[in-house]
Regions:
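S-adenosyl-L-methionine
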Residues: 2-158, 162-167, 198-200, 282-284, ...
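Short internal loop-to-helix segment that lines adenine-nucleotide cofactor pockets
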Residues: 96-119, 167-169, 181-186, 190-245, ...
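Short, conserved loop/helix-junction motifs that constitute active-site signature segments
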Residues: 132-137, 238-245, 270
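Proline-aspartate-enriched helix->loop->beta-strand connector
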Residues: 247-250
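Conserved Class I S-adenosyl-L-methionine
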Residues: 264-280
Length: 353
């Protein structure tokens, strides 16, 4: 008889250390609207604010000063931010909607708190560096990689102004399957910048790229990858590292119905190297029974919930949500069962909405 299927669970507290206290005035209507689709006058107001915001701060390059509070050993620091970077706006919108990548944030605070080396690939303004470096239990270091020149300036400025440079090292480069230069396609939203070998009609900037295997840095214990479809190239460039060092990997995976093979390629690449895949979800009580769902039952900074690492067979990827943060844990690496409790699993527990 085979082993009883299990998922892994742990009680966690979600923490959002960075608090944006001021955005450019044109960003106000955009942030307050959140992810809901406004109607009537609100829709017109938002549309006008959006056009002015991108026209003034994007096309014309006018300054868009904002402010963020970050905890520091000597007290809270108020640091300037570039409000033209829409990733700051998205951070505010997600927090108002209940949380910013709550499952990944909680995972890192829970698992990486003891120390180690973390690579943040596609760091943008440095949220995960700030998250880890402001955790009193974290004794490790973060290497934050960002290829887009303007976004890298925001990353470096955030880490420097927050006084976190001794814990977070910023690298102006992308990671790929080769060393050299590749075109980076940028647009209105910094979080959607992507390396694209055949940029075509899109506006592209040539950026420096390196392979994970060619970096002269401390070997990573954890790698977080958010590179808008370039995940497989990043993994291929670190094949030797993945097979030898065996870091834990978390990466964004989008289901593209037109290219299902591209969706599954990073998953196959990792499982072929002995990694176990997990879907990060939340355990919640519903009508007297336990279910596994996408949204945490309790939301916001300081909320306590039960994080669930649910097995993700590749054959079931298309049945899950379109966008997933996938956890890849080396099957031969100890530690996961020490931090999570194994619990019997059945497909009936899944609430896949």
């Amino acid at each position: 008889m085979g082993e009883t299927p299990v998922y892994l669970r742990a009680r966690v507290r979600t923490r959002y250390p960075a608090r944006i206290t001021r955005l450019p005035w044109l960003a106000g209507p955009l942030a307050s609207a959140g992810f809901a689709k406004p109607r009537g006058v609100r829709r017109l107001t938002r549309k006008l604010a959006k056009a002015l915001f991108f026209g003034l701060h994007g096309r014309l390059g006018l300054p868009a000063p904002g402010e963020m509070e970050v905890p520091a050993p000597a007290g809270v620091r108020r640091i300037p931010i570039n409000g033209a970077n829409t990733a700051f706006l998205a951070y505010v919108q997600h927090l108002e909607a209940g949380g910013y990548e709550p499952e990944v944030s909680a995972f890192f605070d829970h698992v990486a708190a003891g120390g180690g080396v973390v690579y943040d690939v596609g760091a943008n303004w440095g949220y995960y560096g700030v998250l880890l470096a402001t955790n009193p239990a974290f004794s490790g270091t973060v290497h934050a990689f960002e290829a887009a020149p303007g976004t890298y300036r925001d990353l470096e400025a955030t880490i420097d102004a927050a006084g976190l440079g001794d814990r977070v090292t910023c690298h102006r480069m992308g990671l790929s399957s080769e060393d050299g230069e590749l075109p980076l396609v940028t647009g209105r939203h910094s979080a959607l910048a992507r390396i694209e070998r055949t940029a075509g009609r899109h506006k592209a900037t040539m950026v420096s790229v390196r392979r994970l295997d060619s970096l002269d840095l401390p070997q990573p214990d954890f790698i977080k990858i958010d590179v808008e479809g370039h995940e497989l190239d990043v993994l291929k460039g670190g094949a030797r590292l993945l097979e030898g060092v065996r870091p834990v990997v978390i990466f964004e995976n989008w289901f593209d119905p037109d290219q299902p093979a591209a969706t599954l390629a990073p998953l196959n690449f990792l499982t072929e190297r002995g990694y176990d895949l997990y879907d990060l979800m939340w355990e919640a009580p519903v009508e007297g029974r336990r279910v596994l769902r996408r949204r945490p039952p309790a939301a916001g900074d300081g909320a306590e919930n039960t994080l669930a690492l649910v097995p993700l067979p590749i054959s079931e990827r298309m049945a899950r949500r379109r966008d997933l943060n996938v956890l890849a844990w080396p099957g031969d690496r100890a530690g996961i069962t020490a931090r999570f409790e194994a619990t019997p699993f059945s497909a009936e527990l899944l609430e896949l909405c």
